[in-house]
């Protein structure tokens, strides 16, 4: 699968995703689509088929993004899972015969198991970081980010309105307000972020710089909202 297209589009679940979906649907056939586990049911709802769906969380709540049956929509999608995702994730994928693979990151215990033949790759802190690094490994020349807000919307929403766990983030905007303020996308003022999103953003900035310097990959943040990602 290396080099099958020049451009990778990474779909995350920030508040700005909703407005990007019509354009993504229009150009889906012209790029390779990588999506986060939380974006997968949203893309299915809008009949936008990803090439890869990635997941790395160990909690059962994340597994529920796969507790569904989209029938023919899932054909030819590759689900890439970090090797210690919650067991419910693989159970749900196996139930509907979806194609998945387990991958490991570099860690002392993993190395001790001597699973070298299966390979390793660094995955970062979030599933979006994991998507970005896989896109590098698959030798895409351009990486496009959408839905990668890493900040609250002006109305306080943490994720796009189609996100199934919005209720789990109620009160977070009030909790974080004025604590993690950062530069907005396009230098359009300031936005409110969170401690975790700030970590993810810094991780992204390192990855973007590394991709540009060492692999000559150009990254385009097309989120049109959220926090500015330097690089």
Predicted regions and their residues:
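Metal-ion/cofactor- or nucleotide/acyl-coenzyme-handling active-site neighborhoods
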Residues: 1-34, 41-231
């Amino acid at each position: 699968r290396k080099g099958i297209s020049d451009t990778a589009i990474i779909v995350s679940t920030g508040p700005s995703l909703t407005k990007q979906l019509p354009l993504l649907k229009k150009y889906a056939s012209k790029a390779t689509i990588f999506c986060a586990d939380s974006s997968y049911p949203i893309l299915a709802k809008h009949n936008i088929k990803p090439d890869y769906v990635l997941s790395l969380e160990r909690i059962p709540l994340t597994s529920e993004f796969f507790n569904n049956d989209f029938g023919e929509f899932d054909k030819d999608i590759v689900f890439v899972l970090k090797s210690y995702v919650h067991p419910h994730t693989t159970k749900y994928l196996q139930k509907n015969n979806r194609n998945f693979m387990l991958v490991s990151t570099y860690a002392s215990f993993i190395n001790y198991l001597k699973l070298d033949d299966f390979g390793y790759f660094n995955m970062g802190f979030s599933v979006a970081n994991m998507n970005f690094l896989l896109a590098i490994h698959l030798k895409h020349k351009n990486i496009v980010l959408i839905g990668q807000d890493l900040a609250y919307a002006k109305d306080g929403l943490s994720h796009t309105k189609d996100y199934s766990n919005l209720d789990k983030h109620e009160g977070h905007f009030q909790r974080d307000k004025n604590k993690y303020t950062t530069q907005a996308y396009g230098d359009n003022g300031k936005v409110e972020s969170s401690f975790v999103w700030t970590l993810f953003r810094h991780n992204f900035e390192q990855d973007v710089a590394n991709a540009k310097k060492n692999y000559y990959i150009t990254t385009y943040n097309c989120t049109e909202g959220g926090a500015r990602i330097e690089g």
